[in-house]
């Protein structure tokens, strides 16, 4: 048995309810990586690529059928512990955005404020301002390509 990572949504991908911590989930039928079976990832970052929701689980895997560098598929899996990491994901996204903010010619103050503070009361305004700026930049690029004035 091996411990790995897995994100869950409201239900399993096949519609079954998420089992309680410590309860074994078993797959019947063929177990083929990227097709059928119970999957898990080697690192939380790898698991994030397949995340159907913000709840990250530390899982124990048994009867492993196939393995790749980033993931595996098994017949039996159980959740050891889980946590809703929504706030951690939002914080990480804001930090990633700030790491490239120097590429943004003139970011609106509300965008900078949100990225630096995570203040939910200004998130919608920041999203709208960033969207407006992105659309303006895209339009300018297309107008230039077509030889038209903005």
Name these PLM-found stretches:
Residues 1-150:
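Short, glycine-biased loop/turn motifs at secondary-structure junctions and
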């Amino acid at each position: 048995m091996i411990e790995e990572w897995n994100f869950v949504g409201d239900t399993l991908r096949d519609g079954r309810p998420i089992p309680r911590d410590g309860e074994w989930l078993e797959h019947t039928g063929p177990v083929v990586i990227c097709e059928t079976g119970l999957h898990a990832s080697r690192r939380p970052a790898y698991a994030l690529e397949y995340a159907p929701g913000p709840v990250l689980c530390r899982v124990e895997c048994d009867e492993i059928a196939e393995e790749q560098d980033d993931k595996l598929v098994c017949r039996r899996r159980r959740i050891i512990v889980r946590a809703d990491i929504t706030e951690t994901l939002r914080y990480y996204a804001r930090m990633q955005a700030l790491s490239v903010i120097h590429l943004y010619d003139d970011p609106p103050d509300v965008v900078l404020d949100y990225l630096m503070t995570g203040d939910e009361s200004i998130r919608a305004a920041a999203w709208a301002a960033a969207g407006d700026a992105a659309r303006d930049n895209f339009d300018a690029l297309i107008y230039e390509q077509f030889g038209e004035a903005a």
